[in-house]
């Protein structure tokens, strides 16, 4: 009897950044479909814009990162990326990374930072999924498709919005709750909007090479 094809491990992820242009990543978090968690804060080594602090509660003071008045352990960006890579590789199986608004924001930024710091993206990460256009397609009846709105629609509690770990956990719970109401499984839903990692690495490499001084 032929062995069943191994399904990829689904990992829901999110990042927090300093601005909408995302000059610095401040937090990388992820949760697997089985509940394994990754969470790290990154030291920006510079003051953060006021609107960033207003949204995330994060601010930089005297060399340290704080959130809502409390010191947050943080590490340099390069170390954080390497730890994320090691965590992804530790599962020793194909991975699909899932983001909300990933094609326009999270996936582009995380891939760009890997390339910028000369760190090879984990080879076991095959595809990146974006749930934002998927929910727009499947839930046309709601007013918007922000994570908080989707959480409310699916009766999921989101108590710490704009924290990458809380948002990753919420995204996982939202997707799992949603597919229970539809005649499709989680893979069918996620595959509505999926791109291979190569799509992002090639695009970002082209940008980096174009912007390098001659």
Residue ranges and their predicted role:
Residues 2-111, 115, 140, 145, ...:
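Conserved non-catalytic scaffold segment of RNase H-like nuclease domains
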Residues 4, 173-214:
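Acidic two-metal-ion nuclease catalytic site recognized across multiple nuclease folds
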Residues 13, 129, 166:
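Active-site flanking residues adjacent to catalytic metal/cofactor-binding acidic residues
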Residues 112-124:
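A short alpha->loop->secondary-structure connector
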Residues 113-116, 137, 153, 174-181:
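Active-site catalytic microenvironments for nucleophilic, acid-base chemistry
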Residues 128-142:
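Short alpha-helix plus adjacent loop in nuclease-associated cores
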Residues 163-176:
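Acidic, divalent-metal-coordinating active-site segment for phosphoryl/phosphodiester hydrolysis
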């Amino acid at each position: 009897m032929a062995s069943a094809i191994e399904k990829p491990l689904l990992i829901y992820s999110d990042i927090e950044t300093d601005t909408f242009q995302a000059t610095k990543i401040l937090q990388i978090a992820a949760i697997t479909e089985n509940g394994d968690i990754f969470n790290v804060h990154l030291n920006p080594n510079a003051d953060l814009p006021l609107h960033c602090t207003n949204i995330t509660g994060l601010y930089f003071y005297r060399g340290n990162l704080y959130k809502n008045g409390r010191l947050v352990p943080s590490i340099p960006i390069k170390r954080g990326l390497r730890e994320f890579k090691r965590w992804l590789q530790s599962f020793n199986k194909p991975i699909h990374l899932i983001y909300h608004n990933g094609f326009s924001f999270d996936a582009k930024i995380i891939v760009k930072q890997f390339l910028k710091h000369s760190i090879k993206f984990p080879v076991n990460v095959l595809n990146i999924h974006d749930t934002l256009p998927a929910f727009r397609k499947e839930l046309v009846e709601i007013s918007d498709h922000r994570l908080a709105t989707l959480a409310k629609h699916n009766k999921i509690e989101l108590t710490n919005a704009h924290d990458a770990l809380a948002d990753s956990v919420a995204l996982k719970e939202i997707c799992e709750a949603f597919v229970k109401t539809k005649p499709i499984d989680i893979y069918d839903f996620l595959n509505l909007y999926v791109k291979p990692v190569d799509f992002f690495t090639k695009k970002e490499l082209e940008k980096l090479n174009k912007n390098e001084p001659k």
